[in-house]
Amino acid sequence: MQGYVLDINVARDEDLWVGVLTSSKMARLYRFYGARHSVIQIGHKIDFEEEQEGAIPRLRRVMHLGFVWERDNHRRYWWQQYLRLLYRHLRDVEEMEGFYYALLDQASRRLERQDAKRAILESHAALLEYEGRSHGLERCFLCEGKLGEEVALARGFIGAHPECVYGRGIEKARIEWFLREKNSTHLSDLEVEELWKILLQGV
């Protein structure tokens, strides 16, 4: 079985509870500490076995399926940031469709050749559409007034007047195109940084 490590918590001594997103579920597995065990980090794609002993499912025979870009500390850090956010979003879900696993597979391939923040933001736009949260930018979610040519964005990339959320305005047409096409090539680095700050508020 393969999956992405989204969460790690110390149980006792050096044993761990590990949250692994697979193509069909969010597995929460117990890993006993062992000197010969490979290191597990959030963001790793792993091949593993799930072993059921009593009431506690165990994580066994773990192999890290590494990516070349993981050698880049910045890329790895941003990837880990997003996966932590994704875990908070999915932690109460047990069984799920393969969309989320496929999304991370696609994003991890993009990270080989694309700016990390742009790759992750484009994947996040696809997630919003899949979950039915890719709202239009016609009205401010706070005052419900019609939005103009510049909009500010809140968590989940929902639109608002800049003055309503005390946020930076971004050209609405550019954001609409980004959300529709899941493509950030037309966005400036400053706009990407603004979207990244919003993403860090939560999935």
What is the predicted role of each segment?
Residues 1-14, 23-203:
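Non-catalytic alpha-helical scaffolds and adjoining flexible linkers that form interface surfaces
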